[in-house]
Amino acid sequence: MEQVKKAAIVLAAGHGKRMHSKVAKQYLLLNGEPVLVHALRAFEMSGMDTIILVTGADEVEFCRKDIVETYGFSSVKQVVPGGKERYDSVWNGLCALKAAGFPEDGIVLIHDGARPLVDGEIIARAVDGACSYSACVAAMPVKDTIKVADADGFSESTPDRSTLWQIQTPQAFRFELIYCAYEKIFAPGADRSHITDDAMVVELMTDTKVKFVEGSYSNIKVTTPEDMVIAEVLLYKGEKHVSF
């Protein structure tokens, strides 16, 4: 694997309503530790040169003391406030890296803090993929038949399942590529409302094709109470990696 500087931006600024909890999903306890801690630990143990933790503006001090200091995450160099939307939080993280002098040819991995079961193998594949292709995302083939609905809720078409992939995080990029792509969508007058992930920014704003690398069916995003139950079972069984 190419020897480059590696950084992770871990996003923990969301307050998912679907969890139906007063506690933000990233702070819910999973096997006795916050969901966010599991995600951060995976990157801490994967040799990141720096980790930027992006959290809610009113949670920055809490995360510094109760997450970063309490759990000894020495690779977390900054805790920065996020924004209203996911892309705002990513941009804040990228700007923090830029201000810290992160090299343009370095690799940055962007990860949802609510994906606690990411592991070192997925992270390594993402880094390797970004080194080779400049842009890659962890992904898995979809298992279910997917249908496209019309405006009235009737089935309109059925895409070929063999072409459909479930996109996960981390999503990894050469720093210059992802920074410049985000810079364009934050230009005055740019429409960001339809942006759903980082790969989409690269697809829209550059000519670089985004490569899929193997993720894991266990690399779930904790969004609903049922997800917490599934994550507990997977963590208990040690099944953090279910591949192709």
Describe each model-derived feature in a short phrase.
Residues E2-C63:
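N-terminal glycine-rich phosphate-binding loop and ensuing alpha1 helix
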Residues V10, L36, G93, D112, ...:
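Residue-level signal for inorganic ion chemistry
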Residues E2, W165-F244:
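Conserved alpha/beta core of the MobA/IspD/sugar-nucleotide pyrophosphorylase nucleotidyltransferase superfamily
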Residues G72-K84:
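Conserved donor nucleotide-binding strand/loop of the catalytic core
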Residues D49, G106, T208:
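Short acidic/polar active-site loop segments enriched in Thr and Asp
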Residues S46-G47, E69-S75, G101:
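Short helix-capping segments at alpha-helix termini
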Residues K84-A149, Q168:
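Conserved beta-loop-beta/alpha segment of the NTase-like Rossmann-fold superfamily
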Residues V148-F173:
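Short, flexible, basic/aromatic active-site loop/helix in glycosyltransferases
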